[in-house]
Amino acid sequence: MKGKIKSVVFKDAKRWRRWLRVNHRRKTEIWLVLPKKSAGGDSYRVYYNQALEEALCFGWIDSRIKPLDETRSLVRFTPRKSKNWSRYNIERALELMRKRKMTEAGRKVLPPDLISRLEKLGKTGDHAE
């Protein structure tokens, strides 16, 4: 990667979700500043798991992590494709659907075989946008 990375810090997960709601179709990437697991304190209130869950809701995924300093990392999020879903992220997506947090944009990139199974079970109804 050449040049300086433009990064963003969100005060909380609600603000990250708001950014995704507005930008998930317009932007091609964002680099979030997130605390490392070993970092103490609460100066950064969006943590990796929260950031990933909100991203999945809008059809985005994390792709690269770069150290920023001793306590923070840069994490790149981009729109995701339908293939190459890990079992962990499929389970996470199902849980987000149960919680009614998954948006139409998030459902559109679910693996086709998973969508077929969910339709048979009647579990792909409209959820929060």
Listing of model-derived features with the role each one plays in the protein:
Residues M1-E129:
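Charge-dense, helix-prone N-terminal extensions
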